[in-house]
Amino acid sequence: MAVRIDGSYGEGGGQILRTSIALSALLGKPVEIVNIRAKRANPGLQPQHLTGVSAAALLTDAEVEGAAKGSTRLFFKPKALKCGTFNIDIGTAGSISLVVQTLAPILLYAPCPTKLVITGGTDVAWAPPIDYMRFVFARYLTRFGARIAIELVKRGHYPRGGGKAVVQAEPAGRLRAVDSVEFGRPAKIAGVSHAVNLPPHVAERQARAAREALAKLGYAAEVEVEARNDGLGPGSGVVLWAESDVGNVVGGDALGERGKPAEEVGREAAEKLAAVLKAGASLDPHMADMVVLYMALAQGRSRLSTTEATMHLQTNIYIVEQFLPVKFKLERAGPRYIIEVEGVGYP
């Protein structure tokens, strides 16, 4: 019997699809998703969603119905988890990070190590930048006992893409719960400021503005400057992260765009990171919505905190609860929200 998911629930976007496909694939449960992106101006599946679906189908030898542009219904029936090396081309500047979000949980339950070579957009709007996935997402998952490495080969920006990343993961066995409501003391604050096919001073100005904004708040940051000329088009951005003495890692990011001063990009990333540090949360808003799936799969009770109960977070909790016999608690506690669940200890 397929799990039936209403794709218009809550946030009503691609996140529902990504989480549903990931859980269907790794649990071996068929899923039917209806009303996909029904509330959006361009409803139904878009090319970058289709890449995630086809990649998940490749990794699970799945039977798929409705995988076409504009389709508002998708049926996905996985067979067996596969492993090895796979090449995935999103085409244009579809987000590599969003495809990684879909596939990472599947890789952790594959029968042997897996390598994905993914081409597309590394730093694009409405998605976590690739440096966030490398330095926050992948590192946070080690707390659950997962081993996943993301290597940046080449950056790709909107509209032409052409970026490349390599993802390598090992089977995790059973994930362990993480109980860490307090961020702890910042042990290291670092970042990457990049500019591609732009004057090198763009990356330098972004980095300086980020460092100065954090310094005013009492935080010393080391921000690497990366100026490259190997992209298909221009683009820039900043990702900052803070690691704590108890093993937490949180991030803040901003993307450059035409007409937006480099200093504004740096300050925006710094302000996002500072807001999480000020609240003492163990998760930033990006990571909070991505982590609930791993909390539910882990063995034991996980308790983490974040600064916002975003619609993405609430929607992901709803999706996970449709697939697994878990019940999340999401409660306000001062400047933070506490996310708590007793995981199932899969498999």
Swiss-Prot record:
Keyword entries, A-Z: ATP-binding, Cytoplasm, Ligase, Nucleotide-binding
InterPro entries listed in its UniProt record: RNA3'-term_phos_cycl_insert, RNA3'_phos_cyclase_dom, RNA3'_phos_cyclase_dom_sf, RNA3'_term_phos_cyc, RNA3'_term_phos_cyc_type_1, RNA3'P_cycl/enolpyr_Trfase_a/b, RPTC_insert
The protein's Enzyme Commission number: 6.5.1.4
Catalytic activity: a 3'-end 3'-phospho-ribonucleotide-RNA + ATP = a 3'-end 2',3'-cyclophospho-ribonucleotide-RNA + AMP + diphosphate
ATP-binding found in the keyword field: yes
Chief location category: cytoplasm
Protein's name in the database: RNA 3'-terminal phosphate cyclase
GO MF entry, a single one: ATP binding
UniProt-listed CDD domains: RNA_Cyclase_Class_II (cd00874)
Subcellular location: Cytoplasm
Gene: rtcA
Positions of ATP binding: Q101, H286, M287, A288, D289
Role description: Catalyzes the conversion of 3'-phosphate to a 2',3'-cyclic phosphodiester at the end of RNA. The mechanism of action of the enzyme occurs in 3 steps: (A) adenylation of the enzyme by ATP; (B) transfer of adenylate to an RNA-N3'P to produce RNA-N3'PP5'A; (C) and attack of the adjacent 2'-hydroxyl on the 3'-phosphorus in the diester linkage to produce the cyclic end product. The biological role of this enzyme is unknown but it is likely to function in some aspects of cellular RNA processing.
Any one Gene Ontology BP term: RNA processing
Database matches in Pfam families: RTC (PF01137), RTC_insert (PF05189)
Highest taxon of the lineage: Archaea
Positions of the catalytic residues: H312 (tele-amp-histidine intermediate)
Organism: Pyrobaculum neutrophilum (strain DSM 2338 / JCM 9278 / NBRC 100436 / V24Sta) (Thermoproteus neutrophilus)
Family: Belongs to the RNA 3'-terminal cyclase family. Type 1 subfamily.
Gene Ontology annotations for the cellular component aspect, listed alphabetically: cytoplasm
